Amino acid sequence: MAKTIKITQTRSAIGRLPKHKATLLGLGLRRIGHTVEREDTPAVRGMINAVSYMVKVEE
């Protein structure tokens, strides 16, 4: 079984760069407080790094 990580959106996407909004949607995050579980892959880690100021990650 692949390792998963929990990602929670902590800040609003309003007024952010369109690329960052698209990254949040790509992760499956829609609103503040929304939490999703994703596989721990390099692609997902890169997306998290791009929007690290808007999300909280739990291993």
Curated annotation (Swiss-Prot):
The keyword Plastid does not apply. Gene3D superfamilies: Ribosomal protein L30, ferredoxin-like fold domain. GO terms for molecular function: structural constituent of ribosome. It comes from the Bacteria. Pfam families: Ribosomal_L30. The keyword Transmembrane does not apply. Keywords: Ribonucleoprotein, Ribosomal protein. PANTHER family: LARGE RIBOSOMAL SUBUNIT PROTEIN UL30M, MITOCHONDRIAL RIBOSOMAL PROTEIN L30. Part of the 50S ribosomal subunit. This is Large ribosomal subunit protein uL30. It comes from Edwardsiella ictaluri (strain 93-146). The gene is rpmD.
